[in-house]
Amino acid sequence: MLKERLENVRGTNPLIHNITNYVTVNDCANILLACGASPIMADDIGEVEEITSICRGLNINIGTLNENTIESMLKAGKMANKLKHPVILDPVGVGASKLRRQTALKLLEEVKFTVIRGNISEIKVLALGQGITKGVDADVNDKVKDDTLDNVINFAKGFSKKTGAVIAITGAIDIIANESKAYVVRNGNPNMSKITGTGCMLSAMTAAYISANVDSPLEATLASVCAMGICGELAYNRLSKRDGNSSYRNYIIDEVFNLDGDKLDDAARYESY
C-alpha cells in the first residue's frame, strides 16, 4: 500500500507551493526534491494566488509569521480550495504566542485543510483554542505514550471530524487519523528531535504525498510519516563517531532520495485502529 503512494510522487513530480518559515526553507526544498517532488517558495501577497494556481499542492507553515505572510497564507489557501488542491497546515509553536494562535485559528476558519500536522501540544492548542507549547516543541506532559494512546487516537478522530482534515500527530509515537480510522506509527529515531526542521520537512513531504494521491489523503499521510521515520533510522545508522546533527540532517535527505517503495513497505511499522 505505501509503495504505491511513493511511486505516485515519483511518477507525477508534483509542484508544491510552500509558504513556510525562513529557518528551514532550504531543508524543505531539498526534502521535496529528494522525495520526487518539485518545490517553489513564494510568500509575497502579489504572487501567491498565481503561484498556487500552477502548483499541485500547498504547504502552509506558521513558524515565522509576519503581517504580510499571514495575508499571503489566507489568499493562497483560498485559491487552493477553489482549485481543489490539497493543503497542509503545520502550526509550528502555535501555543507560544497570541499571534500564532489567532493566525492558526483564522486559517482554520477560512481555509479547508486536507492535513493538519504537528506535535501533540500544537494539535491540542488548535483543537482547544488555548494552551501552551515549549517554544516549537511538545510539552513533556503531552507526550504520546502507550498508556495514553487510546485517548489520543479518539482525540485525533474527534478533531478530524470537526475540521474535515486528516490529523497527523507526530513524535516518538505518530498518530495519523481521520474521523473513522487511525494509524499508529513506530518508526523514527529519538535523535531526529535534535535537528531543527525535521517536522517542517515532514510537512513539506506530506504535501507532496497528498498531492500525488488525492483520493487517499489518510494513506498518503501514513506513507509520508513512515518514510520520514524510516529515513531517520537509516540515516542514524550511517553516522560515524565524529558526525553530528548537521551530518544527520544531510543523511536523512539522502535516505529520502534513495528510498524505494519496497524498502518503504518492508521497514514501515504501523498498526491500524
Curated annotation (Swiss-Prot):
Species: Clostridium acetobutylicum (strain ATCC 824 / DSM 792 / JCM 1419 / IAM 19013 / LMG 5710 / NBRC 13948 / NRRL B-527 / VKM B-1787 / 2291 / W)
Function field: Catalyzes the phosphorylation of the hydroxyl group of 4-methyl-5-beta-hydroxyethylthiazole (THZ).
Cofactor(s) the protein needs: Mg(2+)
Entry keyword set: ATP-binding, Kinase, Magnesium, Metal-binding, Nucleotide-binding, Thiamine biosynthesis, Transferase
List of residues binding ATP: R117, T170
Top-level class of the enzyme under EC nomenclature: transferase
Pathway: Cofactor biosynthesis; thiamine diphosphate biosynthesis; 4-methyl-5-(2-phosphoethyl)-thiazole from 5-(2-hydroxyethyl)-4-methylthiazole: step 1/1
Highest taxon, organism lineage: Bacteria
Molecular function GO terms recorded: ATP binding; hydroxyethylthiazole kinase activity; magnesium ion binding
Pfam families per the UniProt record, alphabetical: HK
Entry's family note: Belongs to the Thz kinase family.
Gene Ontology biological process terms from the UniProt entry: thiamine biosynthetic process; thiamine diphosphate biosynthetic process
Gene: thiM
HAMAP family (alphabetical): Thz_kinase (MF_00228)
Residues at which substrate binds: M41, G197
Protein name stated in the entry: Hydroxyethylthiazole kinase
Entry's EC annotation: 2.7.1.50
Reactions performed catalytically: 5-(2-hydroxyethyl)-4-methylthiazole + ATP = 4-methyl-5-(2-phosphooxyethyl)-thiazole + ADP + H(+)
